[in-house]
Amino acid sequence: MLTEKDYCDYETCVALKELGYNEKSNWWFSKYLNEDSGQMELVHICDNPAHLNYDSWGIVPKDFVIRPSLYEAQKWLREEKGIIVGIINNFTTHEFDFYVSTWEEDICRGNKYSSYEDALQRGIKESVKILKEKKDE
């Protein structure tokens, strides 16, 4: 069963959206006005596939941010952007390391994460950061 740690966090989802991530999903982030506090709050929405998640043209509502699983984001980065995020376990420390690469070069690495999901989340964040920097050049 998937848990909260199996999905990208809000900041990563916003960055993925800016990079063009627009895959169909039943998981979203959206903001709503909390009438008690008068503040905008972030909510995580799960919808039934039978319900309308997209408008009649298949477009995500502008104020929604798609929330992919870590695997969905990892796969999209690999297939659409040519960025590979991999996880390696460290047998001596029982921790996980990530690496980010293309088919031609190793871009960056990170280590000492207590869970596979934490390492993958960080690797995806680093990938998105690198892609955004290249986009801004």
Locations of the language-model features?
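Short, extreme N-terminal segment that most often corresponds to the first beta-strand
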Residues: M1-F29, E137
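Short, hydrophobic/amphipathic alpha-helical patches that form generic packing surfaces
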Residues: T12-L19, E72-K75, L120-E126
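N-terminal segment of the canonical double-stranded RNA-binding domain
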Residues: V14, N22, Y32-S114, E137
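Tryptophan-centered motif/residue detector
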Residues: W27-W28, W76, I130
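Ampiphathic alpha-helical segments that act as solvent-exposed interaction surfaces
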Residues: R109-E137
